[in-house]
C-alpha cells in the first residue's frame, strides 16, 4: 500500500503535510510521516493502516485523513 505525499485534512479539521511512508526498523510496519500545518509543528508518525482507515464521526463513516492537494 502506498500514500501520495501532500496536504491532508483530518476528519476533525486540522491540516497536515504528509512527507511520505517509512518502514519500522524492528517489525517493518509501514508508518506515515507527517507534520501539522498549524501550531508548533514537529514530525509525527502513524501506522499507514490507521491513517487510511474509515472512522465514525457524528454518526457517519468518513476517512480519517482526506487528500487535499499536492505540496510542490
Predicted regions: what they are:
Residues 1-72:
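Mixed-charge, low-complexity intrinsically disordered regions
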